[in-house]
């Protein structure tokens, strides 16, 4: 199975759920040990996952704010809400706009190395889903959206769970395992 781990981070940046999935070593004889099942790595502690979630939350916020803006045409409308001035006063400074004004500004959406691919999905409520998979796995965006749908059904609709609290719901764990292992 090419899915290594799933982390869910609240809008405040705290880790509310993490789960690693069993992987096998290249010989296939027994499960590999270590972070994400990679050889030569150590297993992360719960504290390490908390630090990882907080760090990623900060980096995601920074990358969301450094989305580049390009100079707007002189013929563009002066009341365009996606355009801003360099000095922020609306004076004679040149105008700048986002590359695609109608598209929402996002942070990191995907990151890939030779060992894993990180796919990120941020819901409208600000909850971030981090999915670590094998780099050769196709359609990780569809997979992470399917995970989000099950999260909405089994966690968000649970009357005993409150937003930003840790997720400890057996029905969610079962639905997640069934979705990932029956694909």
Where are these predicted regions, by residue range?
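Intrinsically disordered, Ser/Thr-rich regulatory regions of eukaryotic membrane-trafficking proteins
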Residues: 1-183
